[in-house]
Amino acid sequence: MAILAFQKPDKVLMLEADSRFGKFEFRPLEPGFGITVGNALRRILLSSLEGFAINTIKIEGVEHEFASVPGVKEDVTNIILNLKQVRFKQVVEEFENEKVSITVENSSEFKAGDISKYLTGFEVLNPELVICHLDSKATMQMDITINKGRGYVPADENREYCTDVNVIPIDSIYTPIRNVKYQVENFRVEQKTDYEKLVLEITTDGSIHPKEALKEAAKILIYHFMLFSDEKITLETSDVDGNEEFDEEVLHMRQLLKTKLVDMDLSVRALNCLKAADVETLGDLVQFNKTDLLKFRNFGKKSLTELDDLLEGLNLSFGTDISKYKLDKE
């Protein structure tokens, strides 16, 4: 079944951008697509991007999160609440987790920036965040573990990383996205005024550029929708390798090559000649070269020119090797 042409943007406009904030514009969109695309991207951005956070802590002399530390104003519960807010950026690609031992002494405040001097693979993005206040003679010894994760993980799920009874699991806020807002506005295309413009604003913690965050969210959505794009939808477990690299261009070409020629508005003569030769889809057609086509019964140069123009308009060409697109002829 042929799909009617959709009004869609040729590209995404980046209206504003720095390391933490980006404003993007998609236009024109069909009526109703603004909220469809905007809401889907917002939910993925807020819940599903990867980041780094503290998942366990150990404070010398403390057995559980409801205890207090001698000489420290805040109790352990409040210290944990503050540690959950510390934001990290990976600076050494090989480091996806790191455990550090921290000693705080001769200081009235323990800030997030004080963790930096103990780190090898990460950078603290909010160094001015105060973790706790100490008396002048107080000393605090703390071990923390930083790891990679997605979205939000509660303390109970981090319990598996506790190596001994005095290690305390904490909630981990991995998402690098601080806020996402979108709005849908009317947009005019020629004489029609009911098209839409989607304006998307993304605020990150600085560990990822807003443009990269948007790209990652789009890839996650496309990867999931790809499961519904095949003509074969079954109740069986998929055999697709979960680690297989996903290529948007390959997916687009794969779907294009599956298009049936009967839906391409060809002349009856050309269509009948191709049908007689069992050439039913664009994928079947592009595998032939022009010489082979002219050998088909009743196939002439006029039909060849018609097909040549068709493929040129779709950025396809004769004699194409389509094996990498893994098409299954049904």
Swiss-Prot record:
Is this entry keyworded Lipoprotein? Answer: no
Matching Gene3D superfamilies, A to Z? 5' to 3' exonuclease, C-terminal subdomain (1.10.150.20), DNA-directed RNA polymerase, insert domain (2.170.120.12), RNA polymerase, RBP11-like subunit (3.30.1360.10)
Q: Which GO terms describe its biological process?
A: DNA-templated transcription
Q: What class of enzyme is it?
A: transferase
Matches recorded under SMART domains: RPOLD (SM00662)
The reaction(s) annotated as catalysed by this protein in its Swiss-Prot or TrEMBL entry are:
RNA(n) + a ribonucleoside 5'-triphosphate = RNA(n+1) + diphosphate
Database matches in InterPro entries: DNA-dir_RNA_pol_insert, DNA-dir_RNA_pol_RpoA/D/Rpb3, DNA-dir_RpoA, RBP11-like, RNAP_asu_C, RNApol_insert_sf
Which GO cellular component terms are attached? cytoplasm; DNA-directed RNA polymerase complex
> Can you provide one Gene Ontology molecular function annotated for this UniProt record?
protein dimerization activity
| Region annotation Alpha C-terminal domain (alpha-CTD): where it falls in the sequence | 253-330
Keyword check for Nucleotidyltransferase, yes or no: yes
Q: What's in the keyword line of the UniProt record?
A: DNA-directed RNA polymerase, Nucleotidyltransferase, Transcription, Transferase
Subunit text: Homodimer. The RNAP catalytic core consists of 2 alpha, 1 beta, 1 beta' and 1 omega subunit. When a sigma factor is associated with the core the holoenzyme is formed, which can initiate transcription.
**What does UniProt say about this protein's domains?**
The N-terminal domain is essential for RNAP assembly and basal transcription, whereas the C-terminal domain is involved in interaction with transcriptional regulators and with upstream promoter elements.
Identify its protein family.
Answer: Belongs to the RNA polymerase alpha chain family.
Provide the function of this protein. DNA-dependent RNA polymerase catalyzes the transcription of DNA into RNA using the four ribonucleoside triphosphates as substrates.
- Its recorded name reads DNA-directed RNA polymerase subunit alpha
